[in-house]
Amino acid sequence: MAQFNFGGVMEEVITDDEFPLQKAREILKDEIVAVLGYGVQGPGQALNMRDNGINVIIGQRENSASWDRAVADGFVPGKTLFPVVEAARQATIIQYLLSDAGQMAVWPQLKECLSEGNTLYFSHGFSIVFHDQTNVIPPQNVDVVLVAPKGSGRTVRSNFLDGSGINSSFAIHQDYSGNAREKTLALGIAIGSGYLFPTTFANEVHSDLTGERGVLMGCLAGVMEAQYTLLRKHGHSPSEAFNETVEELTQSLIRLVAANGMDWMFASCSTTAQRGALDWAPRFRDAVSPVFDELYQKVISGEETKRVLESNSAPDYRQKLEKELAAIKESEMWQTGATVRSLRPENRKK
């Protein structure tokens, strides 16, 4: 593995130069890969593998929107598209990409489909790490592995199509065959990964759940709402409040961070912006650190897992979720956002 310096800490990373696609194809040439779940991660991973010459079939609940989507993407019922259990029975590698609650619900049936030497693949460590709540405990005579793309399912596919690829982490939980690592890396390359970062199932799920609830989604949404509400309270117009809270971040500043780091973003702004941001950043850091401490403890204790499974397993979960998302969409802030997005310069009629 190649060695990279991450802020003074040396880490090993697998590159597609040392593990090229042709090697992945050779390792997987006799395998049947069943992608179970054609919802979030399933489509991108399945389509990328199919385009890379891997023998892929889909397992999905019939008479569902995801089944119809798989058909639209070229998977043929009875040939490359089957009900979940039927697909699992045919496979040598089972990519278990149902939702976390879905994995728990289907597991009693799925475990009966596993044969000695099969590979059980996850893209999230949730079900394995919190097995005391999910009851997902694989038999000892199968490989249990993980490849977790560092992006949404949509990004897995779009980055593959534009040639950039996606970075992923990988882990081996159980190596019955003695070849689990090679198969895992082959699958990582086959789904479109450019770089593969070693991790463990536990580290992946702990960091992932913290990130989603924190900076990546939950914290971001909460902080945006707080600033927008403050500006509106003090008489700023909706468009001004949104532009100074969301639009300038997403359309300008975060791109500078992505390109060259936080210092580059600061250096690219006015001296007034620099001074204020540098002075206030530690105050925000200190204010939110206790919240992050609480969050991480709830993640590693399994409390967040309990909440997720109870909520997402409820029969009215989908209706409640749609109501929550509708409330966000219909709020003044995000209705303003829709208008602001329509007025971006690239949307002007020529």
Question: Which positions does each model-derived feature cover?
Answer:
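Active-site-proximal catalytic alpha-helix in oxidoreductases
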Residues: G178-K233, S239-V257
